[in-house]
Amino acid sequence: MPRRGPVAKRDVLPDPIYNSKLVTRLINKIMIDGKKSKAQKILYTAFDIIRERTGKDPMEVFEQALKNVMPVLEVRARRVGGANYQVPVEVRPDRRVSLGLRWLVQYSRLRGEKTMEERLANEIMDAANNTGAAVKKREDTHKMAEANKAFAHYRW
């Protein structure tokens, strides 16, 4: 924790096409080595694929996917008397969004399709339908929290 008080939270600018801060945050998560224009191209192409395959607005599909991926509970390690306990805690709203975006990109990269655009589009569509690896990650996180419910009184 810094000695000079809390660090100011940086605000991201909405993206030029969809005018959404969420889309900008997703672009930043996709970006590797500062290549933002490449990340934008990947996301916008993925959105075009989603529009083509579903016939729906890609923003609606993306928002539904994010809603299905964001965790409500997670476990955090807490040391009590020489033992480490996995204590279930609620996830802060900003962290929920961050984890959701991170998992969408992370599990898109692990998919088998040829291009990143296809992988991302398919992962977003799967997540919107409550399937896919990112949704499974959320379910696993919730299961861990449920399994460690007995240690909930160690919350801080």
Curated annotation (Swiss-Prot):
Cellular component terms per the entry's GO annotation? small ribosomal subunit
Is-annotated flag, keyword rRNA-binding? Answer: yes
What InterPro entries does this protein's entry cite? Ribosomal_uS7, Ribosomal_uS7_bac/org-type, Ribosomal_uS7_CS, Ribosomal_uS7_dom, Ribosomal_uS7_dom_sf
The UniProt keyword set, sorted, is:
Ribonucleoprotein, Ribosomal protein, RNA-binding, rRNA-binding, tRNA-binding
Q: Which CDD domains match?
A: uS7_Bacteria
PROSITE patterns tied to this protein: RIBOSOMAL_S7
A single GO BP term for this record reads: translation
Q: Which domain of life is it from?
A: Bacteria
Please give one Gene Ontology molecular function term for this protein: tRNA binding
Q: What does the similarity note say?
A: Belongs to the universal ribosomal protein uS7 family.
Q: How does it assemble?
A: Part of the 30S ribosomal subunit. Contacts proteins S9 and S11.
- Role of this protein: One of the primary rRNA binding proteins, it binds directly to 16S rRNA where it nucleates assembly of the head domain of the 30S subunit. Is located at the subunit interface close to the decoding center, probably blocks exit of the E-site tRNA.
Q: What is this protein called?
A: Small ribosomal subunit protein uS7
Recorded source organism is Geobacillus thermodenitrificans (strain NG80-2)
The upper taxonomy is: Bacteria, Bacillati, Bacillota, Bacilli, Bacillales
